[in-house]
Amino acid sequence: MSQSSASSIFTVSRLNQTVRELLEREMGQIWLTAEISNFSQPASGHWYFTLKDDRAQVRCAMFRNSNRRTTFRPQNGQQVLVRASITLYEPRGDYQLIAESMQPAGDGLLQQQFEQLKQQLAAEGLFDQSHKQPLPSPAKQVGVITSASGAALHDVLHVLQRRDPSLPVIIYPTSVQGVDAPLQIVRAIQLANLRAECDVLIVGRGGGSLEDLWSFNDERVARAIFNSHIPIVSAVGHETDVTIADFVADLRAPTPSAAAELVSRNQIELVRQIQGQQQRMEMAMDYYLAQRNQQFTRLEHRLQQQHPHLRLARQQTLLLKLQRRLEESAQTQIRLLSKRTERLQQRLQQVQPQGQIHRYNQRVQQQEYRLRQAVERQLNGYRQRFGIACSQLEAVSPLATLARGYSVTQTPAGALLKTTKQVQAGDKLTTRLQDGWVESEITQVTVAKKSRQKKVVTQ
């Protein structure tokens, strides 16, 4: 035996090891559809079974950490779709499969196609949030792409009629199930974009099995939704149903009824919001008017406090006080002089100086006359000054000016209107007259050429 022949001699264990490594390296993971037989589950929790078809069979194991993710209990005779790795059990030289996942064969194959298309479109960026279009708020016209005889259309129309009866709806009838359904859905989306009648589209159907909903997992439908210039809301099946169309659409609704609610306004809630806004506006207006009334009351009180009549009344009161004090002072002087005169008379009576008495009487009469003259002159002076002060106050009184036919006009800011530069057309003015106020609005502002001033025209 040559040396090269000796080096190629295998032991059984080496052979089994080499075959195992070759199988695992070359085959890797595969998808296999087959029928289950000889299913068993020992206390360890692992599953052991045989996968077979009508001409061959292979042993398979599914360990506990993998089979706990399976959503069903396998049964003998059941067709399944298995994702598994090929290996060799070295002690006996038996090759077998180690299953990683398992699904019922019918839905499982479709689910595999679903996952493959989902990964492909995601890699192309069709699911990216940056491509999502915002829904119009509010929508002016809604398009519905679904079966004309299906329950989904009835649900959508019922919700739209209840929430927003005035919202126009255009129906693009199409098949939603069967071989021709994907192409019809694509054409309906393209037609809606071509006619550009709607600003949002609802694409969907009612619930069903995975096969029933498969039209919305079609790649052509997904690309038509992605290329639509009109925002699309997907509404396929029930809340638990997920399709490729849901990932591509601008917004996914769990049901057709929910899609109708998303694209419509709730008129009852809208009326409630308007009523709330109206109530807040009325409260704000009441508060504004109350503040204005308080401001007018304060201004009226200040104006009354500065009224010339009040100032004249205060001056008159002061003058009366001075007059009383002067009279009291004069009477006090007279009483003192009278007492002094009486004392002098008593002294004169004792000495009977008739000549002196006569002279003193004359002097007393003269002093009394002078005193009365002085008091009268002083009173006349006070009266004259009081009259002059009253005339001066009347001359500068705003009310006296108003009584002569003039008026005082205030700008919206409350300042006195002196020049046309303070106002413009559309402003509202408040004018004070002799007997009240006038509210007016400026319709035109004209500048006088001679005096280079503006003429204010009010209505």
Curated annotation (Swiss-Prot):
Hydrolase found in the keyword field: yes
Molecular function in Gene Ontology: exodeoxyribonuclease VII activity; nucleic acid binding
Alphabetic keyword roster: Cytoplasm, Exonuclease, Hydrolase, Nuclease
EC number: 3.1.11.6
A single GO BP: DNA catabolic process
First and last residue of the signal peptide: none
Compartments where found: Cytoplasm
Organism superkingdom: Bacteria
Cellular component GO terms held in the UniProt record: cytoplasm; exodeoxyribonuclease VII complex
Enzyme class: hydrolase
Reactions catalysed: Exonucleolytic cleavage in either 5'- to 3'- or 3'- to 5'-direction to yield nucleoside 5'-phosphates
Matching InterPro entries: Exonuc_VII_L, Exonuc_VII_lsu_C, OB-fold_nuc-bd_dom
Subunit structure: Heterooligomer composed of large and small subunits.
Biological role stated in the UniProt entry: Bidirectionally degrades single-stranded DNA into large acid-insoluble oligonucleotides, which are then degraded further into small acid-soluble oligonucleotides.
Homology family: Belongs to the XseA family.
UniProt-recorded name of the protein: Exodeoxyribonuclease 7 large subunit
